[in-house]
Amino acid sequence: MKTLLLTLLVVTIVCLDLGYTLKCNKLVPLFYKTCPAGKNLCYKMFMVSNLTVPVKRGCIDVCPKNSALVKYVCCNTDRCN
């Protein structure tokens, strides 16, 4: 019985992510990275002159303010950027 409980515990630990980790797209959305602790937002950065093509994507802790030249879009779910 103890062996069964130990086996179930190990399987649970392996299958579950004990600390939620966010995954954000890199510049090319086919690739993503797992965000380090404390970086709980994904972001996309655009040049205001061309809002259709993002110039940077990744993980961030606080969404930056937009400026006259750069626009940021932030979100908090896996690969949302």
Swiss-Prot record:
GO biological process: killing of cells of another organism
Tissue-specificity statement: Expressed by the venom gland.
Signal sequence extent: 1-21
Keyword Ribonucleoprotein: no
Keywords: Cardiotoxin, Cytolysis, Disulfide bond, Membrane, Secreted, Signal, Target cell membrane, Target membrane, Toxin
GO molecular function: toxin activity
Cellular localization per UniProt: Secreted; Target cell membrane
Cystine bridges: 24-42, 35-59, 63-74, 75-80
Cellular component, GO annotation: extracellular region; membrane; other organism cell membrane
Subunit structure: Monomer in solution; Homodimer and oligomer in the presence of negatively charged lipids forming a pore with a size ranging between 20 and 30 Angstroms.
Function: Shows cytolytic activity on many different cells by forming pore in lipid membranes. In vivo, increases heart rate or kills the animal by cardiac arrest. In addition, it binds to heparin with high affinity, interacts with Kv channel-interacting protein 1 (KCNIP1) in a calcium-independent manner, and binds to integrin alpha-V/beta-3 (ITGAV/ITGB3) with moderate affinity.
Name listed for the protein in its UniProt record: Cytotoxin 5b
Organism: Naja sputatrix
